[in-house]
Amino acid sequence: VALIMLNILAGFEFDGDDPLDVRRLHLESEAARLAYRDRDAHIADPAKSAVPTETLLSEAYAAEQRALLRDDRAMANVPGPSLAPSSDTIYLTVVDTGGNAISFINSVFSLFGTGIVSDNTGVLFHNRGSSFVTDPDHPNAIGPGKRPMHTIMPGMLAKDGEIVMPF
């Protein structure tokens, strides 16, 4: 998803280095909408599904997606797969002055997770499984021996062995 976003954004010129420039934030948000649409439609366990990685990361595809974006308005609609209603989660990323970084997700997903608490431990059970795809024809369908893509996948970007950015 990050690479799809970066490929789309690579075709834009940004004035200066201000990370909070309104146009920059707008285009980053729109690129994210397109990349997450592609994630939900295509990204799956490549050992079990044909994931069109070369297409999704190609310059031609990025140019097609870039053509959908406008500086003066957001896309009215991003067509994509129909997913179950989503909820929120908590994500934490920290980088210290020494360059050490963490990328951490801890979630019960919906408010109070499943609403089920263990009698023995008092632990609240999560319901993150509601985000898995159960349609057997979908490339990311959950199944035996598969590693389906899920939203709880914190990442770390490195260059030349050095941490650049957690996400």
Residue spans for each PLM region:
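Active-site rim segments in enzyme catalytic domains, especially the processed small/beta chain
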Residues: 100-165
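Protein kinase glycine-rich loop
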Residues: 4
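Internal maturation/activation junctions in enzymes
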Residues: 11-108, 120-121, 128
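Conserved phosphate/anionic-ligand binding catalytic regions in large, soluble enzymes, centered on
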Residues: 1
